[in-house]
């Protein structure tokens, strides 16, 4: 039976990109939304990064062409769809620069700011700008995150975008699948754990930084795991408090507490029995 892939990094990355684009403004949405390389500053745009960006763009175009022809029903080899990096001009490349330059400051948001992000408005994902070479070989800004309007006459905006419906469905699917794992599916508060995990993904789902990793599935799984464990720990603490109150009032605690007590007592009895049988045994001496 063929194994079915219900979620993969490629699809998740694509939806994260589309979701972030709803918070961005570009000079030309079709030409400037897709970045070819991520750098930390404009100073890093040089000959080496240009060559790397060419290779990245060629690989992406080759894969897209292969999938397009395959979907059209053609019997085609991937080698036939290869795009040469040399065929891509420098002016076609888009550089994503991770920067806070266009984000307004918010003094006092953090008592002891440690990074530049602590001095700026709180954002739903790391901010960036898109740059490219123009015909005069100058590097110009063609896109900004958390922005509305033109590059020069636009304004900062935080609430005009949203996660795509497909990305939201991916979050729900991931939580549903995680909730069926053997170590969590038996809990009576399984729904509370799922709700907490969905809330967590809605809050941090777009904070995934493509410049640091290309594995959003692991990022999301870790967030879901933390949410489930947090609810389990809270419920266990509440149950222990409830059982303590019941025992203080000479009432029977939960079956979990009773079973734990019986188990601990049986373990103790077995240990004492094995210890006494060992010490009482004395081999007979031969004359």
Place the predicted regions along the sequence by residue:
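A short glycine/small-residue-enriched secondary-structure motif
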Residues: 147-151, 195-200
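Extreme N-terminal regulatory/targeting segments of RNA polymerase sigma factors
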Residues: 1-189, 261-262, 277-287
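Active-site/pore-lining binding-face segments in mid-to-C-terminal subdomains
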Residues: 219-251
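Long, charged, glycine-rich C-terminal linkers/tails
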Residues: 189, 194-196, 245
